[in-house]
């Protein structure tokens, strides 16, 4: 038994270089380190974990310095006390190991996609529309809100048979008077149809006049194809008591108080298009009324209760 224990201790002592350990540990700890190595079973196999992609290629053998995961050799170590029992100040900017050459920040054997990582679809829309229209990409990604209104599967009858496709109608807005409606189609999947509709909606952004930044100017009776819309302005705190499609459009446009009824056809697509057209074309602002009458109109509420 004594011979076996002696042989294992000799084998573990030969595994480490005492000169290397003495650089990082005092002599009082070297003996305990050597004794701790004897408790490791002989049949233990040290392998790299396969489940972790960004893992060092070793487990507990910290006597060797890895070229990527560790610091460069010769750097100061703070765990060993000096003769004066004072610790030196560790400056991270000076001791930090620089990145490997050629701008590669990943360990060997790991790669990323060609685009450098995953991008959101809204970022792709913003980048493309910035080149096409000059709209700020941050405005598209951060301030614009997108809501799908209609998503359905369409089947077209042709000479070759029935061809299925996907249709999407979405609305975008910044909740501050800007709103746009877009349509998209795709034969592959619904997500691509929504992507195209989002692209089209941002290009169709329009400004909606709002009274006190919360409701519409007066009442609107508007007809769009088979849809009849009756929209009424409301007092503060009234809320949105309208059709579910008109509700989503008002949320994106920043309209907070509105009452409305939909008569005749209840087609969601025509309701959405008719609502946008009613907001942009059927409203008459105070300036337009004053210009038509040839008189000066004053908003009494703003005159007496202006801030």
Curated annotation (Swiss-Prot):
Keyword field contains Nuclease: no
One of the record's GO cellular component terms: mitochondrion
Compartment list: Mitochondrion
SUPFAM superfamilies per the UniProt record, alphabetical: dsRNA-binding domain-like (SSF54768), Ribosomal protein S5 domain 2-like (SSF54211)
Alphabetized Pfam families for the sequence: Ribosomal_S5 (PF00333), Ribosomal_S5_C (PF03719)
Keywords: Mitochondrion, Ribonucleoprotein, Ribosomal protein, Transit peptide
GO biological process terms held by the UniProt record: mitochondrial translation; translation
InterPro entries: Ribosomal_Su5_D2-typ_SF, Ribosomal_uS5, Ribosomal_uS5_C, Ribosomal_uS5_N, Ribosomal_uS5_N_CS, Ribsml_uS5_D2-typ_fold_subgr
Protein family per UniProt: Belongs to the universal ribosomal protein uS5 family.
Additional observations: Present with 6680 molecules/cell in log phase SD medium.
Oligomeric and partner information: Component of the mitochondrial small ribosomal subunit (mt-SSU). Mature yeast 74S mitochondrial ribosomes consist of a small (37S) and a large (54S) subunit. The 37S small subunit contains a 15S ribosomal RNA (15S mt-rRNA) and 34 different proteins. The 54S large subunit contains a 21S rRNA (21S mt-rRNA) and 46 different proteins. uS3m, uS4m and uS5m form the narrow entry site of the mRNA channel.
Protein name: Small ribosomal subunit protein uS5m
Source organism per UniProt: Saccharomyces cerevisiae (strain ATCC 204508 / S288c)
